[in-house]
């Protein structure tokens, strides 16, 4: 990349195939703090584990203070040339919004001034201008990826999401947003988002939801029938994760509070940063969560049947004790 006598080093990347084909991608929860000193280990370990990843999803709070150039510089330096070779799908978290003064006038909480200049994201119609390049969708080799902005204007996004999902013909559907549908951090809850968005997620049986915000790890699912302990069919798989050093305690009741919403908690962790590798191949989606040392901590497989229903298959190997 360059012009005249000024050129960057050589960078390789691969564009998507036009047809359905297998691929892998990375998913990170909040990086947020001590990005260069701590998060650099996570993103580099992730690349080492999945060097052919097609893209990486960053589920919000990439930095701690929205408008600070220094923090964004740390985020880009921590990933180094990985950011140049592996496209990012960034999600706006609450820390991507901070009060902004313009000519001495307080404009209230505004999206990071660097966001739209450093990320080139797909435009989305039928949405307020304030959501531009924070709510978008794309398809990749048979999968539809949808990024939501869980900070604001949820009702407008719900109408847009309904339309996108009603027209969706992709085999796999993945939604990513910052605030989790089912909170895992102590003292946290996002009831409005759940009330507005979950009925749509359930209606269209979105396959996978990738979230952040709670600085803990949680994986759960919505069974087709809560009382059926034999049938392994599910509606959706939900994950909350964290990749940076900031950590919270887990909810004392786990996800028991959310049982009326039809969700079950399968595995959790505290005080542990993770990166995730997701493999998509035909009717199979394989989800794996790794610790910074590359050790596998959690894994599960989804099998999409011909009628569009999903079966969840536990990992064949022992994953060890919960942290």
PLM feature spans:
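Extended active-site neighborhood of metal-dependent phosphoesterases/phosphodiesterases
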Residues: 1-12, 70-169, 188, 196, ...
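A short, polar/proline- and glycine-enriched secondary-structure boundary/capping micro-motif
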Residues: 37-38, 114-117, 156-159, 295-303
């Amino acid at each position: 990349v360059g012009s005249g006598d000024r050129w960057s080093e050589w960078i390789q990347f691969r564009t998507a195939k036009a047809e359905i084909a297998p691929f892998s991608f990375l998913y990170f929860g909040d990086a947020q703090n001590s990005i260069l000193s701590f998060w650099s280990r996570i993103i580099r370990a992730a690349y080492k584990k999945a060097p052919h990843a097609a893209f990486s999803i960053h589920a919000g709070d990439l930095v701690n203070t929205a408008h600070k150039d220094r923090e964004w510089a740390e985020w880009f330096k921590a990933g180094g040339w990985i950011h140049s070779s592996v496209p990012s799908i960034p999600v706006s978290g609450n820390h991507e919004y901070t009060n902004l003064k313009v000519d001495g006038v307080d404009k209230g909480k505004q999206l990071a001034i660097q966001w739209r200049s450093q990320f080139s994201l797909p435009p989305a119609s039928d949405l307020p201008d304030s959501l531009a390049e924070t709510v978008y969708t794309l398809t990749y080799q048979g999968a539809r990826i949808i990024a939501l902005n869980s900070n604001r204007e949820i009702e407008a996004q719900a109408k847009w999401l309904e339309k996108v999902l009603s027209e969706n013909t992709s085999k796999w559907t993945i939604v990513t947003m910052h605030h989790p549908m089912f909170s895992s951090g102590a003292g946290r809850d996002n009831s409005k988002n759940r009330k507005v968005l979950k009925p749509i997620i359930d209606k269209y049986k979105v396959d996978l939801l990738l979230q952040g915000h709670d600085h803990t790890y949680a994986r759960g699912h919505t069974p087709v029938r809560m009382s059926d302990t034999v049938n392994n069919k599910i509606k959706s798989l939900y994950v909350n994760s964290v990749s940076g050093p900031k950590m919270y305690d887990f909810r004392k009741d786990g996800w028991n509070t959310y049982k009326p919403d039809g969700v079950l908690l399968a595995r959790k962790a505290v005080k542990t940063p993770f990166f995730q590798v997701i493999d998509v191949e035909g009717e199979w989606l394989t989800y794996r969560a790794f610790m910074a040392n590359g050790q596998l901590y959690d894994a599960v497989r989804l099998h999409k049947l011909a009628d569009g229903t999903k079966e969840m298959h536990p990992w064949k190997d022992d994953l060890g004790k919960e942290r």
